[in-house]
């Protein structure tokens, strides 16, 4: 007979537990996601997240621009209405031709000032 004993490498013993409960399994660190995602996958996920954020930012800017344009239209409409009412009040007191001359004069001044 030949002595061919298969020498399986045994787990190195870690020694006795401090609390003496040697019948329990040794605890391992709880890291369920450690090493599961590769660096490339993380980079890809980060890129995707940045693209989503950029898209959201663009949508927000577009919405804000629409809101500001709407507010500007309302302000212009109100200003035109006030100007019209002011000219109507002036027309009650003055002659129509004089009011038209004043309108033209004010428009010229407005163009020069802007």
UniProtKB/Swiss-Prot annotation:
Belongs to the CGR1 family. This is rRNA-processing protein cgrA. GO terms for cellular component: nucleolus. GO terms for biological process: rRNA processing. It holds the Pfam family Cgr1. Residues 1-114 are annotated as: Disordered. Residues 39-101 form a coiled coil. Residues 94-114 have a biased composition (Basic residues). The gene is cgrA. Residues 39-93 have a biased composition (Basic and acidic residues). Involved in nucleolar integrity and required for processing of the pre-rRNA for the 60S ribosome subunit. Keywords: Coiled coil, Nucleus, Ribosome biogenesis, rRNA processing. Transmembrane segments: none annotated. It is found in: Nucleus, Nucleolus. It comes from Aspergillus oryzae (strain ATCC 42149 / RIB 40) (Yellow koji mold). Disulfide bonds: none annotated.
């Amino acid at each position: 007979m030949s002595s061919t004993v298969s020498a399986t490498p045994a787990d190195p013993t870690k020694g006795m537990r401090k609390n003496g409960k040697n019948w329990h399994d040794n605890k391992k660190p709880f890291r369920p996601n450690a090493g599961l995602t590769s660096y490339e996958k993380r980079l890809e996920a980060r890129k995707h997240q940045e693209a989503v954020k950029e898209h959201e930012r663009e949508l927000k800017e577009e919405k804000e621009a629409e809101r500001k344009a709407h507010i500007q239209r309302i302000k212009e409409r109100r200003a035109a209405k006030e100007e019209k009412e002011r000219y109507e009040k002036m027309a009650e007191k003055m002659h129509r031709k004089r009011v038209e001359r004043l309108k033209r004069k004010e428009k010229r001044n407005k163009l020069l000032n802007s």
